[in-house]
């Protein structure tokens, strides 16, 4: 066991450096994770730009909240509680719930009042320091949310657990999509593709995914995962295309997972059916939506729901879907980078690095 662990630390906006931290001793109630694979998503891009401060991120912090690793050390009480042993591959949710506030007690721990999260919300000045997955080791707090990865599932495959879990929660558990429905997914990134899988699992009849010309490969992947239609909005009128596909009835559910762009929010009002249509807003914009026609919501009786993340009710099904081998999820894993190249991984997710990225990972031991 090394005495120190290198880790990728955000020290300021657009400033990242690799630092070393002591590997902590473990008691009866906590554990130590030997990191294998860290998924990088749009939230990491926001943290890199400094936009995470509005939701509680504080510099300096170790990046990495989509974490897969091997239990290296674990206390007796922690092993009993999490039902895992040394050598087990596990997935970790990013929240560290307090377990006492009304949100935790109600099962809504993503909204925990203490707002502690791996990979963003705990500074490196807080012992035992290793609070993010972009490190060779990560500390497992007694309140960490730990899930055993099914046997036979690789670290690379398991790293897709959060995008798929997000899709399950948004499409199935919140929106209630089911057989016979038409679902439009705006944005074919990893979150949108997770929604495709969730919609397919729910038995949705028509799954329509929209994107730009630069998303051609992602749209192909959407088809491979189960989308019935894909639309390049640079070449086709999305509203007209959805009207054609649905015989003018439009979509039962529209999910906007696009990051930064506000136009899809306004367009969603025209894509969704009247009287009972639902819109899920899952893509952060970090700015107001101009000319948002609120009267459309009233007159057409549309429901709009904001969503963020996943929970235990969607994590377990996500891991089981991955283990089933039903979907070619390997198509999502497009780029991997070593720890020293964490910044390049983030830039790739933000569209300023390697091209044609879908799901990007950091491999801390590479």
Question: Which residues are covered by each model-predicted region?
Answer:
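C-terminal hydrophobic helical "lid"/dimerization subdomain
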Residues: 1-7, 221, 236-237, 244, ...
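Glycine-rich beta-strand-centered segment in the early N-terminal region that forms part
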Residues: 24-38, 52-105, 144, 150-152
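Cytochrome P450 core scaffold surrounding the K-helix E-X-X-R motif
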Residues: 43-49
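NAD(P)H dinucleotide-binding glycine-rich loop of Rossmann-like/cofactor-binding domains
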Residues: 98-186
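Glycine-rich cofactor phosphate-binding loops and adjacent beta1-alpha1 units
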Residues: 174-179, 208, 217-220, 224-302, ...
């Amino acid at each position: 066991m090394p005495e120190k662990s290198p880790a990728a630390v955000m020290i300021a906006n657009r400033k990242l450096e690799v630092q070393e931290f002591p590997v902590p001793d473990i008691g009866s109630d906590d554990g130590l994770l030997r990191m294998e694979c860290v998924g990088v998503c749009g939230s990491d891009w926001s943290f890199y730009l400094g936009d995470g401060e509005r939701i509680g991120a504080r510099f300096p912090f170790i990046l990495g909240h989509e974490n897969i690793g091997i239990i290296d050390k674990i206390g007796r009480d922690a092993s009993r509680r999490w039902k895992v042993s040394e050598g087990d591959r596990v997935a970790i949710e990013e929240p560290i719930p307090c377990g006492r506030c009304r949100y935790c007690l109600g099962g809504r721990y993503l909204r925990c009042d203490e707002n502690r999260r791996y990979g963003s919300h705990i500074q490196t000045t807080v012992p035992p320091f290793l609070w993010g997955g972009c490190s060779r080791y990560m500390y497992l707090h007694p309140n960490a949310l730990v899930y055993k990865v099914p046997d036979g599932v690789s670290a690379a495959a398991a790293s897709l657990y959060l995008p798929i879990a997000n899709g399950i929660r948004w499409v199935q558990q919140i929106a209630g999509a089911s057989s016979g429905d038409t679902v439009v997914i705006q944005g074919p990134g990893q979150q949108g593709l997770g929604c495709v899988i969730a919609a397919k699992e729910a038995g949705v009849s028509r799954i329509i995914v929209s994107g730009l010309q630069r998303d051609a490969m992602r749209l192909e992947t959407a088809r491979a995962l189960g989308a019935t239609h894909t639309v390049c909005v640079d070449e086709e009128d999305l509203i007209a295309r959805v009207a054609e596909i649905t015989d003018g009835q439009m979509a039962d559910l529209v999910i906007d997972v696009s990051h930064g762009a506000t136009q899809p929010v306004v367009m969603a009002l025209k894509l969704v059916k009247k009287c009972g249509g639902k819109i899920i807003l899952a893509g952060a914009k970090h700015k107001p939506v101009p000319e948002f026609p609120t009267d459309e919501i009233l007159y057409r009786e549309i429901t709009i729901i904001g969503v963020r993340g996943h929970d235990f009710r969607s994590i377990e099904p996500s891991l089981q879907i991955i283990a089933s081998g039903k979907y070619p999820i390997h198509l999502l894993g497009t780029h991997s980078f070593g720890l020293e190249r964490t910044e390049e991984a983030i830039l790739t997710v933000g569209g300023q690095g390697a091209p044609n990225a879908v799901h990007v990972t950091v491999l801390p031991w590479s």
